[in-house]
């Protein structure tokens, strides 16, 4: 099949459904304190040189259970973003302590880190295993390829694919992993060409490659191409799966085609083999919510609850968010309690979703309660949660409470604090408290210099600062602000326009302004030309 003829013309969900890799390998690698490998030999040598060994003392460490070993290993690896260090250092330390590190433990940790959007650390686990000559199955290679695409880019993923042994390369899951990379990176032409190659190899025999393409087109804002792909699937005798139905429904939502949506629901009801999942009804609820059809959304959420595994964390997260979207506060709390009962060890992500739901509902008391509960239990401080609390308090005009959150966070974590400071500065500038905003600006610059805190200037914050300078006719302040901005990126046309407007408002001239614009290669717009007539005559 020629994919180029398949379509004649003309989210988060897209990324979620661009998954192409499957179950872990059956081969199990073990690294422990034994002389069976170079890595293990180094461990033995290190243990022999210890004081206890030199004194002839043989120490005995009780072997941890499989479950406790897995928990401890994942805990240490998941905290690396807070504690610093590398995956290799952590794993080597485990071995030095006499703890066996098994491939299935490592694989489970990598999968979990990947799931929670920590691809760099997940890839480092694979890299560590590869350097120790652990056996990789085809599906291991597929997951590794996916992680390389996420951490090192598409070219590196292609190189990894091309350099694989034929036995690992010429497999449906490996080709599918590269297909996923193309779709995630929105490389339409490469994705179509790769689809054709997979088709020639008889690898397009299920819904997965089609789902990847559909997800890509949704993210390319081309939802009209999704039904065409569904028809092509059916012509091949490939039945839509639950993921297919979800993306297809999402395309109808994007096109405001509620009639088409109802037809899909009817088809799903008649399709005895339709493997609808909780995801299917989650997307249906989201579409109805967007259309303002809250009763239908509520009905879809009830169907979602019937389909979901009561122990599934993700489904609870979606339920809380979607119930908040239709202003069903009591339902949000009910699902939250259900999650805590099913999964007593509530992680940061679950608290994050709950805080987002509280924020969406404008439930300030709920924000305070949930945030306080999280702070008392968390073992890895996550500024994303603090930022939600800060933003919600500011929306409620509770600046002092928001600032207390930042003060507490600075005592308990190393940041980054840039997002929190931006939220506070925007609020202060909007309420004519520029002096306090400037103090936060100075602190933000200091944080960035001392801790290399990444700083992404929002256009809203930049414009608010310049509006303040223009109103105050503060040319010196505007110039100093430009110097600060230039430390992160070259000044652009919009920024220079703000600066020149400040000069004009202050009725001051800048004889070298035209030269500055030329040196910085700023395109002179008509607006700038008019301003220069008075600022740089």
Swiss-Prot record:
Keywords annotated in UniProt: Mitochondrion, Repeat, Transit peptide
InterPro entries linked: Pentatricopeptide_rpt, TPR-like_helical_dom_sf
Metal-binding is among the record's keywords: no
Signal sequence interval, chain numbering: none
GO molecular function: mRNA binding
Chain positions of PPR repeats: 171-205, 206-240, 241-275, 277-307, 312-346, 347-377, 382-416
Acetylation in keyword set: no
Places the protein is found: Mitochondrion
Domain of life: Eukaryota
The organelle targeting sequence, given as a residue range: 1-18
Assigned GO CC terms: mitochondrion
Family to which this protein belongs: Belongs to the PPR family. P subfamily.
Record's protein name: Pentatricopeptide repeat-containing protein At1g02370, mitochondrial
């Amino acid at each position: 099949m020629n994919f180029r003829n398949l379509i004649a013309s003309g989210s988060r969900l897209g990324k979620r459904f661009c998954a192409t890799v499957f179950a872990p390998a059956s081969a199990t690698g073990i690294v422990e304190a034994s002389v069976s490998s170079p890595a293990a030999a180094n461990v033995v040598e290190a243990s022999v040189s210890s004081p206890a060994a030199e004194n002839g003392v043989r120490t005995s460490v009780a072997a941890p259970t499989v479950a406790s070993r897995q928990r401890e290993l994942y805990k240490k690896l998941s905290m690396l973003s807070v504690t610093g260090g590398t995956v290799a250092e952590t794993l080597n330390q485990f071995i030095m302590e006499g703890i066996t590190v098994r491939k299935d433990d490592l694989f489970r940790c990598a999968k979990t880190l990947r799931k929670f959007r920590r691809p760099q650390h997940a890839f480092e686990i694979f890299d560590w295993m590869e350097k120790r000559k652990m056996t990789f199955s085809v599906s291991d290679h597929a997951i590794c390829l996916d992680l390389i695409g996420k951490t090192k880019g598409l070219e590196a993923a292609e190189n990894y694919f091309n350099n694989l042994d034929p036995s690992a390369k010429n497999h449906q899951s490996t080709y599918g992993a590269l297909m996923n990379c193309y779709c995630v990176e929105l490389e339409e032409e490469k994705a179509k060409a790769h689809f054709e190659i997979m088709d020639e190899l008889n690898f397009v025999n299920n819904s997965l490659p089609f789902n990847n393409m559909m997800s890509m087109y949704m993210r390319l804002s081309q939802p009209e191409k999704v039904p065409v792909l569904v028809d092509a699937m059916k012509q091949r005798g490939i039945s839509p799966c639950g993921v297919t139905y979800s993306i297809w429904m999402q395309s109808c939502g994007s096109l405001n085609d509620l009639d088409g949506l109802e037809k899909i629901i009817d088809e799903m009801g008649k399709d005895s083999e339709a493997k609808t999942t909780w995801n299917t009804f989650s997307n249906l609820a989201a579409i109805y919510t967007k259309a303002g059809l809250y009763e239908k959304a509520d009905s879809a959420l009830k169907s979602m609850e019937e389909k979901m595994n009561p122990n599934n964390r993700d489904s609870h997260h979606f339920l809380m968010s979607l119930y908040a979207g239709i202003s069903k506060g009591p339902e949000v709390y009910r699902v939250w309690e259900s999650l805590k009962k099913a999964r007593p060890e509530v992680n940061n992500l679950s608290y994050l979703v709950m805080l987002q739901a509280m924020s969406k509902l404008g439930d300030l008391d709920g924000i305070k309660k949930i945030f306080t509960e999280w702070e008392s239990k968390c073992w890895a401080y996550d500024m994303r949660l603090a930022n939600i609390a800060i933003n919600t308090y500011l929306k409620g005009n509770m600046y002092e409470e928001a600032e207390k959150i930042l003060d507490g966070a600075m005592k308990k974590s190393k940041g980054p604090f840039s997002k929190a400071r931006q939220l506070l500065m925007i609020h202060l500038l909007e309420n004519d408290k520029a002096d306090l905003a400037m103090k936060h600006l100075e602190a933000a610059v200091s944080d960035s210099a001392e801790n290399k805190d990444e700083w992404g200037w929002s256009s809203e914050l930049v414009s608010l600062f310049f509006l303040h300078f223009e109103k105050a006719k503060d040319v010196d302040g505007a110039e100093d602000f430009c110097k600060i901005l230039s430390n992160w990126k070259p000044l652009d046309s919009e920024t220079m326009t703000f600066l020149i407007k400040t000069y004009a408002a202050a009725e001051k001239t800048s004889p070298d302004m035209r030269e500055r614009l030329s040196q910085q290669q700023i395109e002179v717009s008509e607006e700038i030309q008019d301003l220069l007539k008075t600022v740089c005559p």
